[in-house]
């Protein structure tokens, strides 16, 4: 094995270049990361509304929905489709022990512009309906009841592509959403890159696995950590780490 030393945010990382072929497991079973399905318990209303991001806003008449969701539901047989804004709201509890950790909302897809509010505060935005994104909501959470509100629009923009042809570009949170809770030192969103540069040259018989991982340190402390990546074969048996 070869070891390469990197420094990122005050953390020393040993990134292992594993000289074995096989599948790569980058998340161990005992990982401190929690992933919570965030698809249930939403409310939705078509249109744009002042103060809909505020926790005290009256959404009692809004439609109760689950995700994934589309602006066109239940009008998918209509010849026309709605272009404009829609709001989503969801209340959820937070325990005290979560507040010292990092919490992210991970969206697999929102068409096509999204503004994410937590307890009335703008936590982040995203443009583009085909790519996932992660929003850090840690600073806006409180113990007890919390409120996330998402303002979405599917208005035409010349700088957001592709949008042409006969396909219907309905708006909405049309893919899954997760609440991901991580320790203060954590692997970033899509923070692991894996390549096998000589696998084709060796015709799949053997190859080196190159791994790069970005680790973020939000603890405010400088320390030394050991980053462990495990290689398993097709049957799930550990081959190296």
Question: For the regions a protein language model found, what residue spans apply to each?
Answer:
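Bacterial N-terminal signal peptides that target proteins for export
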Residues: 2-15, 22-25
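Accessory carbohydrate-binding/adhesion or oligomerization-edge regions at the termini
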Residues: 14, 25-79, 147, 151-157, ...
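Accessory beta-strand-rich segments of carbohydrate-active enzymes
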Residues: 36, 48, 70, 83-189, ...
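Short flexible loop/turn segments that cap and initiate beta-strands
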Residues: 55-57, 222-228
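Structural beta-strand segments of beta-rich domains
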Residues: 103, 205-213
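Active-site region of glycoside hydrolase catalytic domains
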Residues: 188-190, 208-210, 225-227
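Short, solvent-exposed loop/linker segments at the N-terminal edge
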Residues: 196-207
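Acidic, Ser/Thr
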Residues: 216
